């Protein structure tokens, strides 16, 4: 065999041997366990961490193939979980505790939110600066278990929620407040509060500013409750 051909033959054998060694040393792909995570609401910044973990491969690193199921008005995540239609669910603690009282065998395995994100937002000229000022006013809430902090604040202020003010179920936006159809509206720090600040003030043509608003934060009032947690069935 000519020297030149011998060189290329030896190089080919070396490359093939190296490839076989690399293949032999490479671990077999990890078998992933499929699981489903039910969100409490539609996709929004509230759930950014779960999607970031999918995008960055964190779940796969732990041997999990996670399917994230979007929530909706008619979806109760803890009930979806209890019925076996999801392996895990994200739900506010008070709502899940109500479901437990009703027989749902679910447990909190990860308390994600350490502070409440719920606000009650009013216009500055409404002169609402504390829960006591809701007396005689129309106050919005979404209901569906989202009203527990509000009701606790009303009672802590010495008001009767059935007699001293009007509690109105608001849509999942800030239209009632923007149209001044309520004196105060429920909002989350990571969603609806920003919606107001992204709306245009028709009197100025500029976006509303924080100084145009009064915000009652339930963490300050003392009636805040734990919110987003990851729940699993007791037999998990």
Model-derived segments and their meaning:
Residues 1-34:
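Short, low-complexity disordered leader/linker segments with a strong preference
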Residues 8-11, 51, 60, 209:
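Compositionally biased, intrinsically disordered low-complexity regions enriched in proline and serine
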Residues 24, 139, 221-223:
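A short, ordered amphipathic alpha-helix with a cationic face
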Residues 30-170, 176-179, 183-190, 215-218:
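Short, glycine-/small- and polar/acidic-enriched structural segments
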Residues 94-95, 172-176, 180-236:
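Pocket-lining segment of extracytoplasmic ligand-binding domains
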